[in-house]
Amino acid sequence: YRVDSQFGLPGRENSREQPTGKERGSEGWGSQSAAPSDKDLPTGGHLRLFSRIMQPTNLPARARVVVIGGGIIGTSVAYHLAHMGWKDVVVLERDRLTSGTTWHAAGLIVTFGSTSETSTEMRKYTRDLYLRLEAETGRSIGFKQFGFIVVAADKDRLEEYRRVSAFNRYCGVDVHEISGQEVGQLFPLARTDDILAGFYVKEDGRANPVDITMALAKGARMQGATILEGVPAIGLLSKRGVVSGVQTPYGNIEAEYVVNCAGMWARQLGEQAGVNVPLQAAEHYYLITEKIPQLTASLPVLEDPSSYGYYREEGGGLLVGLFEPVCAPWKIDGVPDDFSFGEISPDWDRMGPYLQKAMERIPISLDAGVKKFFCGPESFTADLRPVVGEAPELKNYFVAAGLNSIGIITGGGMGRVLAHWIINGRPDCDVTGMHIDRFHKYQSNPDYRRTRTVESLGMVYQCHYPTRSMQTARGCKKSAIHDRLAAQGAYFKDVSGWEGPDWYAPPGVEPTVEQLSWGRQNWFPYWQAEHQATREGVILMDMSFMAKFLVQGREAGALLNYLSANQVDGPSGLITYTQWLNEGGTLEADLTVTKLDDERYWVVASDTAHRHVETWMRRHFPANAHAFVTDVTSGYAQINIQGPRSRELLQRVTTTDLSNTAFPFRTAREIDIGFARALCIRITYLGELGYELYIPSEQAPHVYDRIAEAGKDVGLRHAGLKALASLRMEKGYRDYGHDIDNTDSVLEAGLGFAVDLKKPGGFLGREAVLAKKAEGPLKRRLVQVLVKDPEPLMFHAEIVYRNGQPVGYIRAASYGFTLGGAVGLAMIEAGQAIDQAYLDQGDWEVDIAGRRFAALASLRPLYDPDMKRIKC
């Protein structure tokens, strides 16, 4: 589908910043959040505030952790490390604390709005931390709990916010749906005639970002951390792939860990260490009016995404913040080192229409004078999620950056998450969606950042349809048969940068999305036909985006077997489904390992786990081991032939005997197809008889043509990722990063069948799995859930009820055309054993946008539970 045509234009670099990087606006964010100056500090001077700030001549020779960046995130990381017992922490700030973005942040404290459990918990923790900071440090942060309201002015946003509010309430956010009239009572100056509903959190509000940062820094100092201002990091030290210290103009600091919290400089800082941090600064705007007598200081924060704006009182006037749908990237070539408290000259012509639209929500603001129209840079990422975690390129080098305008909102929680991660070696929350290793190096290319950022900032206030795909910076990665799939009517979506067929339009129909919605869209019947063809006939599915590795060497089998919970070093020519676990017995990867021969293994993982899987192998293979990992993803196309007639079709194009006797389930063997050779593996992710073909990319078009021609007589149909989702969900197949994640025990995830506790040599995480088994019946389990009513749709984060009580939420879902309703996988938690009796004795329901629907819950696959169809 087409988003605004302007998305197709490359974003321009803006060079309208004021000439002096040190210069800062006299207004800043008004009296509440101006850039810090000595007179703002009750102790009588910025440097004098921190008694432990050292002169460069007294630079510490070593520290356990060096945090680079003194904004909200850097000080929060230091604060939490120190409070968790790691007191030998040094924060390096190249200028002064809060410089860059923190000083001009809006200071909103909002817990509502996310359908990520991790993000919601970080928001809640952050608010709670800010509430207690003053008592701990003696420094006020200006936290005013005046409340927060987001309004829905159209049906789709109402649907979205009802879905979000149900999930947020489950997570402990006290959000209430209110009428437009009630919105007007809470914010009397707002126009409410078109508002369908508002969503109100009384305990949320606003605070001063500068004071929050200073309080966190003081709290860190009180626990023994050191804060150094005016000390830039000019280089990284490392030894054999492990960080060893930081270079400064005044000498080096040896360090066991380095944390890059450099905000919009994080990409440039990462480059010094060879670490990829793909984020980009963009223009971000707000306007402050002259004083409005009718405006009271105690008004709640108001947000209206359909008008591009958020609103709060500021110094007697109205602050109008903007997230325009098409933004302007700033300084593609790099943020200047001395741009600390600077402003960008605002583009009135570009922003005028958006500003007009936003101010119409508060009509009185249109007649008020303009006190300040401010533009400052803020960093955004390609998928609007943070960049967090240990860098795959350099061990013990951590990053927390690219907060996409939620740095203050999640700052406390982000610091806690990263501190726990560093100290314990692994995180205690789901980080699959924000881990730095999800990105690839090309996403830091200037053209990519310029083009994608035009769209990404605007996504903050777009309606977050679950089927939406980013439209910019596309076309870089295509499979070898892309043109042939396009000719078949493929509608492509962004799949980790690849062009992945989502669904196929029938002949004569343009593959476009006519209208995004939460309901059945124009492509729904095309998807249904692909699903049914897989269950009844045969389909071709391009999965070339999957991560593929060839692992070779005399010790390759033993090392892979140690990483794998299942036995993967058995007979040659056999594929094995397995998980990789950490020492705590929770999941790190979900993949297949195929033994080609005693010294060659074929490892296949999901696209999102690509770099994580590669890094996991490299980090766990001893340096002197005779084992070598080669990423062959781009070298091989993956074409899957699936369905009851798949054997019949493939047998027409190969001389290899594919009978059930000669080529049973889990067999892997090289076969001939036309003039090509392909690795053929009998396996399925769709719940039917099927085969995966791995073909050298240069031969893939030839193989495709042979299969397509032979398929004409057996009704071959092409199928896309929508069908993949619905078919695998009916079967209850897991997808790491969607319905299972790094917080799940392999047993809780329902994958105990893929664990071999008795194999010689054991495996990484075995002791934790045994300990989990010893605890007795599981009280937390992944359960398949089917909505009995065929009409509603599930996507993610719908709350599951048992006997009227919330017991979990849907992690991922699709529509089960064979089962006759929406179907998903939910992690259920209870104070008792979750077994068949627990399921049978429950009255199950799912909340979908505020309405509850009867449901069926099952521990066994609802489709073909006896696995007969895949082994026939």
Give each language-model segment a name.
Residues 36-65, 83-87:
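Extreme N-terminal leader/targeting segments of oxidoreductases
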Residues 76, 110, 117, 235-345, ...:
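Flavin-dependent oxidoreductases
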Residues 82-102:
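Glycine-rich FAD pyrophosphate-binding loop
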Residues 106-111, 148-150, 274-297, 353, ...:
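Central beta-strand plus flanking loop segment that forms part of the substrate or channel wall
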Residues 107-186, 306-311, 315-319, 338, ...:
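Dinucleotide-binding Rossmann-like beta1-alpha1 core, especially the glycine-rich loop
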Residues 128-132, 144, 153-229, 234-242, ...:
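Flavin (FAD/FMN) cofactor-binding and adjacent substrate-gating region
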Residues 337, 345, 349-476:
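C-terminal catalytic lobe of FAD-dependent flavoproteins
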Residues 429-430, 436-872:
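Glycine/proline-enriched, intrinsically flexible loops and inter-domain linkers
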